[in-house]
UniProtKB/Swiss-Prot annotation:
Organism the protein comes from: Burkholderia orbicola (strain AU 1054)
PROSITE patterns for the chain: ABC_TM1F (PS50929), ABC_TRANSPORTER_1 (PS00211), ABC_TRANSPORTER_2 (PS50893), MSBA (PS51239)
Self-association state and partner proteins as the record states: Homodimer.
Comment text on domains: In MsbA the ATP-binding domain (NBD) and the transmembrane domain (TMD) are fused.
Cellular localization per UniProt: Cell inner membrane
PANTHER family per the UniProt record, alphabetical: ATP-BINDING CASSETTE SUB-FAMILY B MEMBER 10, MITOCHONDRIAL (PTHR43394:SF1), ATP-DEPENDENT PERMEASE MDL1, MITOCHONDRIAL (PTHR43394)
Gene behind the chain: msbA
SUPFAM superfamilies per UniProt: ABC transporter transmembrane region, P-loop containing nucleoside triphosphate hydrolases
Membrane topology per record: Multi-pass membrane protein
Taxonomic placement: Bacteria, Pseudomonadati, Pseudomonadota, Betaproteobacteria, Burkholderiales
NCBIfam families assigned: MsbA_lipidA
Protein name: ATP-dependent lipid A-core flippase
Length: 593
């Protein structure tokens, strides 16, 4: 299955360019501009030392050799070489350290902003984006920006200055020969521009396929039990192989495009070198150049080739960096969920009302919810029943504002939920989902998630959830690590730990999506008792799967195709003989079987 990466998009109307990326990075660079300037100065010193080497060769060859050689040239040139090497080494170390300091500071800021925006986006973001895409953006792709800030900047600044210094020295030595070398540069620039556009497109497609490959691995790891039980190893291997081969194809196309630049550039440079040697030989016969001048010129010209090659090779990491920037700033620019009207809500009574609420996901042919209206009194328990796809989960997701209704109003204590501060509203709600989510932390931290653990309250919550004895038997008690998503706990323990978390929060409104996973009778009994304690005295909306839960509800709302088609108590709905009675009969027969 292919996923669409909606985070990665051009950063302006004309597409992503280095200048666009620089503009986005400027607010992060500006506070550190003094350090950046110092790094550029030290890189300039490094570049200047490149031109210093051939500059020392000329007097050495012209005046330091032979019986008539200058004694001063014999000694000051070697000493100057050592001095140049020392200055170059210190400057290179300083520039590398300063740039890495700047880039790591910016990397930290970007990573923190990305994670902060990710946790404050709406639920639609998590439905739209795969986990592998978000993980790649925050953990891996942001390092491409680090590569741009260090390696690419070093290349662009230091090697550009090196080329400028060397070309300046070449003009000083022999401007006629230098013009021949300069003729080659436009040809190199044309090659770079042609290769540049293709590399950018290939990089974008390559990184999209990398996310696809990560998604396949993520699905296979997460669903390993299904893979093994259904003998899906061959199918998953085929999926992975197909995507890996596509990824390899794009990698080879990138290698071909990126690899052409260097040999073509070197070929053009060799033509220039051959012409220079020919003309220099003619000039030397007319005493227009010296041996030292010729060697210094050829040395300078050869020294120009390496930084030019680096400047050309910078395209690939630069394009990867710009492609990564699209993903990074796509996440940073993702709109945050609305924070509400700012009205405080310190302690809700628990009164809930839906007034003609409708909702659709945009692509659906019919609304997921169609003009739903009902009212829940404080402390009342409402069970939601209905066939799969009837809108039960969507309905409960609207209450904590994971989504906002497309029409109608939801009220808590007589006030529209949009008027409340979002955090204040959610602080009045606890949720126990069908898919239990636990964090790779201690028992205590999972129970008190989002708050500072009070060990006495944690212990009380565990006792109410019938989990205290099991935790006490663990080697580290409350400090026991549960593993990734509670993998070190049994299914019943995971469910009861999620219930303990809701008990610890002690919110007046409870949203419960009962788990349908089969448990042994002992675990089922413990979970059911914990749920009953959890629901005591709380306004509860429960998507009920157990007959016992449905039967003890104050009212049952039966949904079908996004509408409430029946409402009443368990006995009333059975007597009515409608959809609920039909669903009840099917479930009763399944349980009896």
């Amino acid at each position: 299955m292919e996923t669409q990466n909606t985070l990665r998009k051009p950063m302006d109307g004309t597409g992503t360019s280095p200048m666009t990326v620089l503009k986005r990075l400027w607010p992060y660079i500006r506070p550190l501009i003094g350090i950046v300037v110092l790094a550029v100065v030290t890189m300039g010193v490094v570049a200047a030392t490149e031109a210093g080497i051939p500059a020392l060769l000329k007097p050495l060859l012209d005046h330091g050799f032979g019986s008539h050689g200058s004694d001063s040239a014999k000694w000051y040139v070697p000493i100057a070489v050592i001095g140049l090497a020392l200055v170059r080494g210190v400057s290179q170390y300083t520039s590398n350290y300063l740039l890495n300091y700047v880039s790591n500071r910016i990397l930290l800021q970007l990573r923190l902003e990305m994670f902060q925006r990710m946790i404050h986006t709406g639920a639609s973001f998590f439905q739209r984006e795969t986990a592998s895409t978000v993980i790649n953006a925050i953990v891996f792709e942001v390092n491409q920006i680090l590569s741009v800030l260090t390696g690419v900047m070093v290349t662009l600044v230091r090697d550009s200055l090196t080329v400028i210094f060397l070309l300046g020295y070449l003009f000083y030595l022999n401007w006629r020969l230098t013009l021949i070398v300069a003729v080659i540069l436009p040809g190199i620039g044309w090659l770079v521009s042609k290769i540049n556009r293709r590399l950018r497109r290939l990089n974008r497609e390559h990184q999209t396929l990398t996310n696809e490959l990560s998604y396949i691995v993520e699905e296979t790891v997460g669903g390993y039990k299904v893979v093994k039980v259904h003998n899906g190893e061959a199918y998953e291997m085929d999926r992975f192989t197909t995507m890996s081969k596509r990824l390899r194809g794009y990698a080879m196309r990138m290698t071909i495009s990126g690899g052409l630049a260097q040999p073509l550039t070197q070929f053009l440079a060799s033509i220039a070198l051959a012409v220079v040697i020919t003309i220099a030989v003619v000039q030397s016969s007319n005493d227009q150049t010296t041996v030292g001048g010729f060697v210094a010129f050829v040395t300078s010209m050869l020294l120009v080739i390496s930084p030019l090659k680096h400047l050309i090779d910078v395209n690939q990491p630069l394009q990867r960096g710009m492609t990564a920037a699209e993903l990074i700033f796509g996440l940073i620019d993702e709109p945050a969920e609305p924070q509400g009207g700012g009205r405080p809500l310190s302690q809700a009574r628990g009164e809930i009302e839906f007034r003609a609420v409708s909702f659709d996901y945009g692509a659906a042919e019919r609304p997921t919810l169609d003009r739903i209206s009902f009212k829940v009194a404080p402390g009342e328990m409402i069970a939601l029943a209905g066939p799969s796809g009837s809108g039960k989960t969507t309905l409960v997701n609207l209450l904590p504002r994971f989504f906002d209704p497309t029409d109608g109003t939801i009220l808590v204590d007589g006030v529209p939920v949009s008027d409340y501060d979002l955090h204040a509203l959610r602080s009045q709600m606890a949720m126990v989902s069908q898919d239990v989510v636990l964090f790779n932390d201690t028992i205590a931290a999972n129970v008190a998630y989002g708050q500072t653990p009070d060990r006495a309250r944690v212990q009380a919550a565990l006792e109410a959830a019938n989990l205290a004895d099991a935790v006490a038997a663990m080697p580290d008690g409350l400090d026991t690590l549960v593993g990734g998503n509670g993998m070190r706990l049994s299914g019943g323990q995971r469910q009861r730990l999620a219930i303990a978390r809701a008990i610890y929060k002690d919110a007046p409104i409870l949203i419960l999506d009962e788990a349908t996973s089969a448990l042994d009778s002992e675990s089922e009994r413990h979970v059911q008792a914990a749920l009953e304690r959890l629901m005591e005295g709380r306004t509860t909306l429960v998507i009920a799967h157990r007959l016992s839960t449905i039967e003890r509800a104050d009212r049952i709302l039966v949904l079908e195709a996004g509408k409430i088609v029946e409402e009443g108590s368990h006995d009333e709905l059975l007597r009515h003989g409608g959809l609920y009675a039909h669903l009840h009969r099917i479930q009763y027969q399944q349980q009896a079987a």
